[in-house]
């Protein structure tokens, strides 16, 4: 009788844990990553791209960086808290030689209460998690991009970028990659031709700009 009750209790705990996992944002995408990893785990010492949909949609990222082994773990319209939540699933296990982060865009879009300081503190949390579990890890942060559809958020994005840039300049083995100058017209407006019709996600010519900006910082 006791064993039967124990089995029932353990079954309930397992069910609750599974339900809670599925209730987490982007759980399906993370599950797919882990399923793929269980079939063929990526090689160690690769370069990991992680963050939001600007990386997720860069599905042919490996073709932009020939000679490098790239793992792409961009997912959904993720925010920095989402990347933090899943760091133990899609960052730490790979033991990459370098982590390239693009995130923060959706943090501002999610709520007007999110400030540049909010995003900065979230980034530092992610940075500290990576460095604590992968000591000395080479970390790159791609600037939050100037999407025309989110122009009202540009002032906060610029401030967050500056805070992150300043912070990374004081860290070892870390760099901030500024892509704003190449994505703006002479009058300061965003180059609409770089974007899909939603004026948020980029086309191939936008990613070509990112490739040129990122390539000099990639670890051989």
Residue locations for each model-derived region?
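Catalytic His-Asp segment of secreted/periplasmic serine-dependent ester chemistry enzymes
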Residues: 146-220
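Alpha/beta-hydrolase-fold catalytic nucleophile elbow
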Residues: 102, 142-143
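Bacterial Sec-dependent N-terminal signal peptides
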Residues: 1-25
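Charged, glycine-enriched surface loops/patches
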Residues: 118-142, 159, 163-174
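Active-site flanking residues adjacent to catalytic metal/cofactor-binding acidic residues
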Residues: 50-51, 142, 177
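Conserved Rossmann-like nucleotide-binding pocket used by diverse enzymes
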Residues: 17, 71, 140, 175
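Sec-exported extracytoplasmic/periplasmic mature domains
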Residues: 88, 92, 104, 128-135, ...
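Conserved SGNH/GDSL esterase-like catalytic core that processes O-acyl groups on lipids
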Residues: 24-124, 148, 153-158, 162
């Amino acid at each position: 009788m006791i064993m039967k009750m124990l089995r029932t209790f353990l079954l309930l705990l397992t069910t609750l844990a599974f339900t809670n996992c599925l209730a987490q944002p982007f759980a399906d995408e993370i599950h797919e990553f882990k399923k793929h990893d269980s079939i063929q785990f990526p090689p160690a010492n690769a370069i990991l791209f992680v963050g939001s949909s600007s990386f997720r949609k860069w599905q042919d990222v490996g073709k932009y960086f020939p000679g490098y082994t790239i793992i792409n773990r961009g997912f959904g319209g993720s925010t920095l808290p989402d990347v933090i939540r899943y760091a133990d699933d899609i960052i730490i296990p790979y033991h990459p030689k370098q982590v390239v982060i693009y995130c923060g865009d959706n943090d501002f879009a999610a709520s007007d209460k999110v400030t540049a300081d909010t995003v900065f503190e979230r980034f530092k949390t992610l940075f500290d998690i990576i460095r604590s579990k992968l000591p000395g890890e080479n970390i790159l942060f791609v600037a939050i991009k100037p999407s025309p559809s989110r122009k009202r958020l540009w002032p906060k994005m610029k401030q967050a970028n500056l805070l992150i840039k300043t912070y990374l300049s004081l860290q070892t083995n870390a760099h901030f990659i500024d892509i704003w100058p190449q994505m703006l017209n002479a009058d300061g407006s965003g180059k609409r031709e770089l974007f899909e019709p939603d004026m948020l996600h980029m086309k191939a010519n936008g990613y070509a700009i990112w490739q040129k900006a990122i390539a000099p910082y990639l670890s051989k």
